[in-house]
Amino acid sequence: MRVLHLGNIANNAYSNAKFLRRKGVEADVLCYDYAHVMAQPEWEDAEFEGHPDEVNPRWEQVDLNGFRRPAWFIQEELAPRVRGRCKQWFKGQFRLERLVRDPVRWLHVFIKYRLENLLSGTEPRPHAVDFFKIYPARKWFQQWFKGYDLIQAYATEPIHAMLFATGQPYVAFEHGTMREIPFEDSTTGRLLTLAYRQAGRVLITNPDVITSAQRLGLTNFQFIPHPVDETKYRPRPTLLRDQLVNRYQTDLILFAPSRHNWALKGNDLLIRAFARLRKEVGRRAILILSDWGQEVDRSRALIGALELEPVVIWTPPLNKTKLIDYYNAADVVLDQFTLGVFGTVTPEAMACGKPVVLNFNRQVHEWCFPEMPPVLGARTEHEIFERMVEVSEDRGYAAAVGQASREWIVKHHGWELVADRQISVYRELLQR
């Protein structure tokens, strides 16, 4: 079985292909016109120091300690002429933030689509000009697709799979893309809606987008967990913890690696709760934050106003090898406090045996997991503060939650489960 994974936002395709290859599937990844550092195999698996350029890393200038990207990871570019005429379908991972910051747009999208549904009974159909806009890329994609039994297309790439796969079935892999894009009155929105409907299967990784799937009238979808390798993300000793304890004379290490967007992540709630932990409880705690996101300056200003600078440590965005060190050095990992669902931070930290505090909507996840994860739920500043106090005052409780967290990941979120679900889908589609 030969499967091409098209697109590689956040290394999801790379991780899935690795899992599938362990199971004997000949899975390749095609990443074209997108060289972001977090979409590169080196970011996921290499051990290196320093901080490569975010948009166009020069790996030949970095000591990767012997790591070489696998031959099955293919980096390509469309011809300049084609690239100039074809819209770049996926602009990154920040579309959702625009909506959260602009609730009027939420209302506009909802009203517009509701009226169109009432008037026509269906969503807007693609226009002929929509197809002409991407037709120039046809021969490149058809050449890339040759020889594969099936295409798994990520983000907005199902559009290209729908239009240019000649006879192969395709699977659409949704990782946040369904929240907004299909409801746009745009070429991408119209074509993506059609591509989801024409897909052999739509794999959903974010439980909350089931409402989007239902609005689109999809019946061909199923849930699959985010690809996280619990054989790599696991409890292990690290010198980093001793270094942090000795340098800051701390007895509690809190780690919050999420990017800074207050509306989406609730970073301000976390910072204020941490200030209360220091001042009201007197914990000699430190908070480690990641220096990335649109509102880093805003977070820094709040930290300054609360006089927390000496006990807040900033790190640059961490490659995955370093990230595992920080997970294992921490007593508690904190994720987001607004959305009610998790991305990769939560399962990565859980796989490392750490208790995780986040806003978790159990109801949204009931269709996905037979057993809810043993996370520590918190949505408000006071609830975050309470969870911090609980894990700091009862280390036995924190350790038990961490152990249960890893056990849950192995059982309900492990790499083998993720691979087996995809293989089951492929076999079903190829037997039709």
Where are these regions (language model features)?
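Acidic anion/phosphate-binding donor-loop and adjacent secondary structure
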Residues: 182-185, 228-243, 250, 325
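Active-site proximal beta-strand in glycosyltransferases
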Residues: 30, 150-153, 157-159, 163-182, ...
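A short, active-site helix/loop in glycosyltransferases that binds the activated sugar's phosphate group
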Residues: 160-162, 181, 197-232
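Conserved donor-binding/catalytic core segment of Leloir-type glycosyltransferases
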Residues: 203, 237-265, 271-276, 288
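Nucleotide-activated donor-binding/catalytic signature segment of Leloir-type glycosyltransferases, i.e.
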Residues: 297-317, 332
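Membrane-proximal helix-turn-helix segments that form the acceptor-binding/catalytic region
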Residues: 132-146, 179-202
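Short hydrophobic beta-strand element within catalytic cores of glycosyltransferases
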Residues: 355-362
